[in-house]
């Protein structure tokens, strides 16, 4: 279980995340939703142990997030993090040297399912191809928690189905998968739990299936929560 307790992050006078208490349980796919600037990335970086909170704590399986727990979390950022001269094959070897839980076999299967050439130079890749490579690298780790920040950015509509299948094929009952996005329709197709964040505050966590059975789509609820907000 991954849990934040009154987690807060301030940048000067700006409060990016405000006293967020959130619990993520194994066996679930969480979709963290909110417009750009709502605090999704900041919360994820703190939960992954990559950013120090101003206040509050993050706990993972009964201990505070630190070096031990950080090794069990695979976080995919929105920023590119490959050397331009690399190919996917070289990038895989590079990550294998850094992470003991990285599987080249799993990585190559991810590349195949996403139709990526492992010998293609990264400099020759489109934005969408580079985005797919980031997902493949992250999901090739046998982590306890996967966090994918805006995984569908830059990926065309036709490629998203294959990417969803590739991501979900890695899920198991003992894993936690968290994806952040402002693409609501994509989250409805992949997440079973929806986490709504507005201006750094946790609004609610909802069961997606129960919402749909009650006649409310994620898009409906998104509009209700974020109507009138700039960038929503």
Residue ranges and their predicted role:
Residues 56-69:
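Conserved ABC transporter NBD signature motif
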Residues 78-134:
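ABC-family P-loop ATPase nucleotide-binding domains
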Residues 146-150:
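Catalytic Walker B motif of ABC-type/P-loop ATPase nucleotide-binding domains
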Residues 33-35:
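The feature captures the beta-strand-to-loop junction immediately N-terminal to the Walker
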